[in-house]
């Protein structure tokens, strides 16, 4: 076919350009480039997500147009990836971006609180912006309040990354539900490790497990100690560095293998997983030289331990229910735990 008669794979306009691995017009190239770096959620499609299935396409639907970009095979541009020609600069930018986002989460966790009374995960995820209120020193924070606030700030942290906001609403919900308890555990354990503490706790020292009403313990102390200490012990064994933690924290939830994701959701997460994993690998090669590949594997092995930690939390939660504990968890905390056996 004559080049003049070829059509953009996304919108069908005539074009001779090839952008992001796909035959695509200049308009769709600019559209894709703008979206892959935005941190503001895309407006949901209210037409059943079929605006680009057949002509005439509805170009005003940002969500469907972006999904079509993914479907036809558009890939992340080289300037977002840690490649041979831009390695050190791109690595520094990537780490700085994650570090700054973590610092914002820490400020929200330590100095603010959320006024919503008892929302569930759907309520929090659907908020375009979470509103925080400055916390006075006299405000009392107990286990229930800290656990809830930690979950809110963790979800908010995840939603600051472009790939989360680019997912379809159903995929976004699946990703966040599957990940925020594990990510919160990694962040809390790293904070404890950096502070040279032996156990996971909340910022004011409140235990990460609730106080129960039982005079005689009904849950194994070994299980409780695993929840409090095992992840920190592994971090200490690895002697994990801050930059490694930053990259791992994003890789933890940038996971295309999560069950029930759509094909487009898997494609998007695969692209960003490649971006962050290549950054971590290059960091390891730069820092540890010949030992870089083995260090990279050791760090990724932490995800297996976090899965076991999550299983322990679920086990603990089930035992609390079986033993009729009087501890009442907030909906958001329960949703994160119950996601494992409701998906």
Curated annotation (Swiss-Prot):
Pfam families: Hormone_recep, zf-C4. This is Nuclear hormone receptor family member nhr-167. Keywords: DNA-binding, Metal-binding, Nucleus, Receptor, Transcription, Transcription regulation, Zinc, Zinc-finger. One of its GO terms (molecular function) is DNA-binding transcription factor activity. The keyword Cell membrane does not apply. The lineage of its organism: Eukaryota, Metazoa, Ecdysozoa, Nematoda, Chromadorea. It comes from the Eukaryota. Orphan nuclear receptor. Belongs to the nuclear hormone receptor family. It is found in: Nucleus. Gene3D superfamilies: Erythroid Transcription Factor GATA-1, subunit A, Retinoid X Receptor. Its main location: nucleus. Residues 101-339 form the NR LBD domain. GO terms for cellular component: nucleus. A zinc finger (NR C4-type) spans 8-28, 45-64. Residues 5-81 bind DNA.
